[in-house]
């Protein structure tokens, strides 16, 4: 993980660690002119590692985004941001996206009153995301909400931290996307 964030920069969904400043100066191979191929590859790798996708999953999302109306890049980022694991991370119910994936895989999360155990589940507007009524599930979410620094919540999401409930209001705006992509 640390090699990846050192190479690609800060990936907030991947880990809470940040790369040290000045690390580029120590490695002379990283400096110099960057080719177009290298820039595109690094941006693709940022997407993959930030959202925890395989190469095949990312290609499938790109195909869906190409078929949709609008800018392919914007539609792709909207698709990735509306995944259940990412929404849990944005709500603060998990400290990282891999942590959110684990919550979903272990069946702690309900969407509209039904257990969903697929992290790539695509949330829609007016979806209600809650935890199971079990004490263990609530404790996991409570620890995550308490330990996470309170960042500004995107306007397409609402959270009720006392009931451990989140609501998807609308599809995300491009200005709320947390990853800087070139």
Curated annotation (Swiss-Prot):
- Which GO terms label this protein's molecular function in UniProt? rRNA binding; structural constituent of ribosome
Q: Keyword annotations for this protein?
A: Chloroplast, Plastid, Ribonucleoprotein, Ribosomal protein, RNA-binding, rRNA-binding
Q: S4 RNA-binding domain: from which residue to which, for each copy?
A: 82-143
Per the UniProt entry, what are the Gene Ontology biological process annotations, in alphabetical order? ribosomal small subunit biogenesis; translation
Q: Where does the UniProt annotation locate this protein?
A: Plastid, Chloroplast
Q: Which Pfam families match?
A: Ribosomal_S4 (PF00163), S4 (PF01479)
Region Disordered: list its residue ranges: 12-31
Q: Which Gene3D superfamilies does the record cross-reference, listed alphabetically?
A: Ribosomal Protein S4 Delta 41, Chain A, domain 1, RNA-binding S4 domain
Q: CDD domains annotated for this entry?
A: S4 (cd00165)
Q: Does the keyword Ribosomal protein apply?
A: yes
Cellular component, GO annotation: chloroplast; small ribosomal subunit
Q: What is annotated about its quaternary structure and interactions?
A: Part of the 30S ribosomal subunit. Contacts protein S5. The interaction surface between S4 and S5 is involved in control of translational fidelity.
The UniProt function text for this chain reads: One of the primary rRNA binding proteins, it binds directly to 16S rRNA where it nucleates assembly of the body of the 30S subunit.
Name the NCBIfam families on file: PRK05327.1 (NF003717), rpsD_bact (TIGR01017)
The protein in question is named: Small ribosomal subunit protein uS4c
The source organism is Hymenocallis littoralis
């Amino acid at each position: 993980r640390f090699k990846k964030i050192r190479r690609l920069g800060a990936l907030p969904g991947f880990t809470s660690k940040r790369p040290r400043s000045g690390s580029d100066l120590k490695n002379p191979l990283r400096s110099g002119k960057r080719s177009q191929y290298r820039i595109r590859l690094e941006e693709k790798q940022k997407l993959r590692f930030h959202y925890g996708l395989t190469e095949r999953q990312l290609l499938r999302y790109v195909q869906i985004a190409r078929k949709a109306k609008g800018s392919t890049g914007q539609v792709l980022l909207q698709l990735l941001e509306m995944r259940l694991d990412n929404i849990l991370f944005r709500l603060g119910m998990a400290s990282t996206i891999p942590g959110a994936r684990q919550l979903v895989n272990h069946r702690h999360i309900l969407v509209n009153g039904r257990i969903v155990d697929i992290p790539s589940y695509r949330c829609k507007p007016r979806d209600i995301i809650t935890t199971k009524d079990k004490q263990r599930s609530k404790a996991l979410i409570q620890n995550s909400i308490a330990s996470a620094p309170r960042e500004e919540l995107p306007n397409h999401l609402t959270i009720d931290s006392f009931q451990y409930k989140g609501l998807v209001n609308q599809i995300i705006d491009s200005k709320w996307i947390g990853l800087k992509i070139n």
